[in-house]
């Protein structure tokens, strides 16, 4: 444990941010999974794809994912969506 007051605060802040990022990343994974399931079943594909791309863009904007990772995931979802049509 740190002894300096500012270091103690940094530990608390980092724990809080880690928890928040974990929650956001989990929600993102769920959204992507729902999009993939929608593509397989063929129901509400455009809505699911829109939600997934929006979530990926938000995650990239908040530095939860790297922007290139988000772009790659969006590209792969779009490719799967077009292949399913």
UniProtKB/Swiss-Prot annotation:
The keyword Ribosomal protein applies. Pfam families: Ribosomal_S20p. HAMAP family: Ribosomal_bS20. This is Small ribosomal subunit protein bS20. GO terms for biological process: translation. GO terms for cellular component: cytosol; small ribosomal subunit. Belongs to the bacterial ribosomal protein bS20 family. GO terms for molecular function: small ribosomal subunit rRNA binding; structural constituent of ribosome. It comes from Ruminiclostridium cellulolyticum (strain ATCC 35319 / DSM 5812 / JCM 6584 / H10). Gene3D superfamilies: Ribosomal protein S20 (1.20.58.110). InterPro entries: Ribosomal_bS20, Ribosomal_bS20_sf. Binds directly to 16S ribosomal RNA. Keywords: Ribonucleoprotein, Ribosomal protein, RNA-binding, rRNA-binding.
């Amino acid at each position: 444990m740190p002894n300096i007051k500012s270091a103690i605060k940094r530990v608390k802040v980092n724990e809080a941010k880690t928890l928040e990022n974990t929650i956001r990343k989990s929600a993102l994974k769920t959204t992507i999974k729902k999009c993939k399931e929608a593509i397989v079943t063929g129901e509400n594909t455009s809505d699911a794809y829109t939600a997934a791309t929006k979530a990926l863009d938000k995650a990239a904007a908040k530095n939860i994912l790297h922007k290139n990772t988000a772009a790659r995931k969006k590209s792969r979802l779009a490719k799967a969506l077009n292949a399913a049509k």
